[in-house]
Amino acid sequence: MNDFLPAIYLSFLVALLAGTAIFIVRQILRTRKTESRLSQLQNKLKKEKGTAQEYYELGTLYLDKKLYVQATKLFQKALSTKEEVEPENRALVYNALGFTHFAQQQYDLAVRQYKEALKLNPEYVKALNNLGHVYERKQLVAPALEAYEQSLQYEPNNATAKRRAEALRKRSVTSS
C-alpha cells in the first residue's frame, strides 16, 4: 500500500502539470493569433482607408484590451465610412460604441448609442440588455425593467434579462 502512494502522487502531479501546460499553450496560441490580427489591421489601416468591417474588427480587439478611447475612434470611423453597411451591422457598431462609453462611465452617451442600435434593429436583444444595464447604473429602475422586458419579448429564454428583470421587480416591491 505504501509503495503505491508515491506513484499515485507522481501520477497526479504529472497529470496536473500536463493539464496546466496544455492550458498555457492554448492561451499563448490564442494570444498570438489575436496579436497577429491586431498588427495586420493596424498596418493596413495606417497605409490605406479601411472598410467598416476592418475598423469594427480592430475596435473590437482594442475593446478586448480595454483601450476604450482608441476603440471609440475606430467605431466612429466604421460608422463614417462611405460604403453601404447593412442596418444590422451598423447596429453592432453602435452597440459596441455604447459599450465603450459604458465602460468609461459615460452613461448618457452609452444610452444614446444603444438607442441608435435599436433604431436600426429593434429586436437586438444584446443592445436591449445593455440599455437596461445602463439604466440600472443610473438608478432608473422603470426604464431598466422596460428594456429587460422588451428583451424577453424577443428572446423569452434570455438568462440575463430574466435575472435582471426579476431582481428589479424584487427591488421595486421591497422599496414600495
Where are these regions (language model features)?
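Long, contiguous interaction/recruitment modules in multidomain scaffold/adaptor proteins
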Residues: 1-49, 53, 60, 67
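Terminal, low-structured helical/coil segments at or just beyond the last alpha-helical repeat
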Residues: 2-19, 153-176
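Canonical positions in the second alpha-helix
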Residues: 44, 78, 116-117, 150-151
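TPR/Sel1-like alpha-solenoid repeat signature
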Residues: 55-62, 74, 90-101, 113, ...
